[in-house]
């Protein structure tokens, strides 16, 4: 038996399809690059990386963190994934560019061809109907359907365009997160919204035997798994080779992010019923199409001797001129590009997702090439970030902790002056039951771990709209050209933390 949640990592807005014996899932990656990650599975429970659809999106100044600009909380949102007549299709909007992107490929691992669809389709979902007509369903509060032209570049002239359902004036959250599927002659639209009297993510489904007819239905799941009042919702359904059906949704889980949840679906009179007696089961059984298959981990340690592993993503577009990976030495080096006021504007910050319910990371930093005022180290990346690192001040090396508060105030705790320019840093995070706390440590010459600063409170906020991540960073506060060298990154999950 398998236990929910499945990945225990921040993979929000999941969309899952099956092609023969393989399941594929796409998820929102926002401002992290490369972007639009695709995972694969043979049992819907265990997942591994397949590919990223793009290295960078449009390479705008904001996507590159230039001139104080950024795309936090924007970037690529809520992609849908389809397989139609031998081709894969992925479509999403980017909230910073206000464009709708469509990528296509004959193979799941690419190469992917990029094009635009005229218009902006929030949380869109594509339908290839059996008569050869193409549609996109989308919207917030009001859910619309628009017929697209044959080459999927724009709405079809005089094509179908109509309102399907509405949750207008819902004070919490109206319908969005559209997933449209045609199953046994019926059209199904799966949506997320909130209860009107309080914040509670809820899954809804409407169906019709015609795109021009009335869509009927309602809520199909309102359950928080007994977890902090955080509802499970948003996603579609997928069938197995033996004819069973499952839904892949997600649950807000505090600062660690939004985590996928898997639950069974059964059919009665052409309508889907989610879970077991209306609730998400703690345990779920799914038969693997490839029993015994060994999956590559989605997060983990790295000695940097094998290139940049796919578990790493950059915060915004990387600038290859200012980072260097030395596989022979096992090092990742960041050189500062411009003076920054704080960590979130640092270029080439390398990140990995944190994991529920707790995790820790360690890294060794060589600060010998820092310039005056430079800061380098290990962070818990979000808008209210925590970081432990080393700085060069009046020609001497000092340990420090950075503590960004919810009110925007940045506190700095300075440790002792150290003689060594090489140090180890450790960051521990506890997300259990939304405790959402981080602690920072350092050590010199492989001695004892020494705490620095106070316990830091982590938050999931809409300004970044992503789960907290470990990050390796280096930025300049006075002059550019300094650098920091990282090696021996170690990742510990809940069972390995000592």
Report residues per predicted region.
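Carbohydrate-active catalytic/glycan-binding domains of CAZyme proteins
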Residues: 1-498
